[in-house]
Amino acid sequence: MENEGKNNMNGMEMEKGKRESRSRKGVELTMRVLALVLTMAAATVLGVAKQTKVVSIKLIPALPPLDITTTAKASYLSAFVYNISANAIACGYTAISIAILMISRGRRSKKLLMAVLLGDLVMVALLFSGTGAASAIGLMGLQGNKHVMWNKVCGVFGKFCHRAAPSLPLTFLAAVVFMFLVVLDAIKLP
């Protein structure tokens, strides 16, 4: 009789553990989909940002200014290319990790969980470094640098700056989502 009560209690505890595990997997899947959407949006927003404008350049004070058609694109700055690449890599990794975790629903080994944890950690570092690089160059374009006589670029290419700017908080949010995923991954490890 006493054993029946213990078995019944263990059965309820196991059911509760399964529910918690399912809800944790649901949270993880939701966060991974969010990371996928954020990284894809950030890479796309920055990748398609472009503005062409006619800029007047005065070479010699005695001559009239020269009108030159100039284009601003993210691909012209290595920091922006790095940020786009970081987001594209994180997006691809997220899609692969979602597929792997969906395929191995009930059979997640410790090695798989450790690999996902390490992958998520790499994505955190990659996305934060991409945000930092693009933010530094973006700030330089917005404010210029009087010490080295670099002019403000956003004064001339305002549309480009306004189109590219949203990719920075999107990348930052994706990095934060990956940080939460790292915490979830660490909790899952026994």
Swiss-Prot record:
The chain crosses the membrane at residues 29-49, 84-104, 112-132, 164-184. It is a multi-pass membrane protein. Residues 1-24 are annotated as: Disordered. It is found in: Cell membrane. Keywords: Cell membrane, Membrane, Transmembrane, Transmembrane helix. InterPro entries: CASP/CASPL, CASP_dom, CASPL. Its main location: membrane. Residues 1-12 have a biased composition (Low complexity). Residues 1-28, 105-111, 185-190 are cytoplasmic. One of its GO terms (cellular component) is plasma membrane. Residues 50-83, 133-163 are extracellular. Residues 13-24 have a biased composition (Basic and acidic residues). NCBIfam families: A_tha_TIGR01569 (TIGR01569). Belongs to the Casparian strip membrane proteins (CASP) family. Homodimer and heterodimers. This is CASP-like protein 1E2. It comes from Arabidopsis lyrata subsp. lyrata.
